[in-house]
């Protein structure tokens, strides 16, 4: 009798641990896909903002590749994936360092204070901040999580 109860407890523990593993996998996949969806939304906003760079050094460069996702990693009891604007310090010829300014804008700059010669300012396009604000993470996460869990049940 005692042996039968131990066997039932052990199988129940194994079942719960397998469910936890599978739900963690599903959560990891859902976080990853949500990160990709957010990145793609920010890239679409950047393309539609009408930003053109005419500098000869940056002619072939694609600014959209400066909006990137990081790897999925564990943070405490959950998973995390960063979506960010990259500044490429290795390749000085890529225009990615401009993305932060294009997103948030700059104040008007002056060359010399005595003559008040204006160099200009960059108007904020807010392609990244609008993507983050409009992205409905909870809905997307629940939708993807339900799909992944339904695949596991089959």
Language model regions located:
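Short, Lys/Arg-rich flexible segments
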Residues: 1-93, 104-154
């Amino acid at each position: 009798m005692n042996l039968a109860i131990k066997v039932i407890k052990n199988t129940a523990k194994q079942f719960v641990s397998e469910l936890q593993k599978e739900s963690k996998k599903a959560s990891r996949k859902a976080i990853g896909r949500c990160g990709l969806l957010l990145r793609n939304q920010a890239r679409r906003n950047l393309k539609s903002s009408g930003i053109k760079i005419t500098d000869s050094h940056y002619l072939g460069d694609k600014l959209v590749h400066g909006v990137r996702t990081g790897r999925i990693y564990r943070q405490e009891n959950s998973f995390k994936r960063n979506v960010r604007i990259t500044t490429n310090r290795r390749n000085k010829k890529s225009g990615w360092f401009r993305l932060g300014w294009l997103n948030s804008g700059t104040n008007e700059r002056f060359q010399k204070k005595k003559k008040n010669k204006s160099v200009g300012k960059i108007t904020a396009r807010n392609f990244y901040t609008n993507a983050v604000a409009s992205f409905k993470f909870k809905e997307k996460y629940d939708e993807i999580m339900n799909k992944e869990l339904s695949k596991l049940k089959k």
